[in-house]
Amino acid sequence: MTSRLPTSALMPVLLATAIALPAAAHAQDSGQCRHSAPQTLALDIEGVRTARFDIGASKLRIDGAPSPDATLRGRACASSAGLLERLVLEQSKSGDTLTVRLRRDTSGSMGWFANNYAYLDLTGQVPANVLVQAIVGSGDAWVTGVAAASADVGSGDAELRRIAGRVTAKVGSGDITIDDAGELKVLSIGSGDVEARGIRGPVEIGSVGSGDFSLEGAAGDVRIGSLGSGDIDLRDVTGNVSVDSIGSGDLDVREVSGNLAVESKGSGDVSARDVRGTVTIPRKR
């Protein structure tokens, strides 16, 4: 089932993820809004267990609530009336998954140039017992107070706070902040940054390229796959820390109640302080 709001009624807005231009991001950050229109979308949340938001270059704030009003509200902004009318906000539902997309209507010949921009700034509530998935291009997302959450970020930013269960994250060149979550799984970090605090369970990191990962407080084991040329900073871990491989990057570990084990290491450095268990670090290759 698909619900699409006609542009003539609501003129909904957003660049598709692949068309998140720097000019649009600058306009969003500086609050430019030459042409605007109020936006409202009633979410079809009946029986929903997963709410997926594909926001591209826009801003979205989602809060979990026991009795949510389940309505997105905000405004659309664009550099021209024509661009405003070409942007679409739509939702579709498949089984227990609701997908909300904010995209540009690519029909016609209107192009995107250096001074063009279009973005949406929305706030809404969903049931507190759902999984919220945020797909972010160059925009910004805030998710608070839900059962579980995931963030797939390109060059934008995402903040996930007070998540009861697991947070899953993946970032290219952007930034992700996680504060107070049941457990954490980071699939990959490119050149961006992930900062985590107050994780009440285990932490798993797939790969870190040239970016950074920092963790303060984890009530479980921390497992790291590979570290390239970036940096990893770990503090206050109640459990063991294990790392499969380190290239030229640096690992800084403090206040670990269990063991620290690094399987292989290149030219990078490992600093370990206040580790109560055994410390196993190979010599540089």
Give a label for each model feature:
Residues D233, G239-S242, D252, G258-A261, ...:
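Extracytoplasmic/luminal low-complexity segments enriched in Pro/Gly and acidic/polar residues
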Residues A9-L21:
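Bacterial N-terminal signal peptides
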Residues L60, D193-V194, D212-F213, D231-I232, ...:
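Short loop/beta submotifs within extracellular cysteine-rich repeat domains
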Residues A25-V136, W142-V153, D157-V171, D175-S188, ...:
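Acidic (Asp/Glu) and glycine-rich low-complexity loops/linkers
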Residues M1-T7:
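N-terminal secretory signal peptides that target proteins for export/translocation
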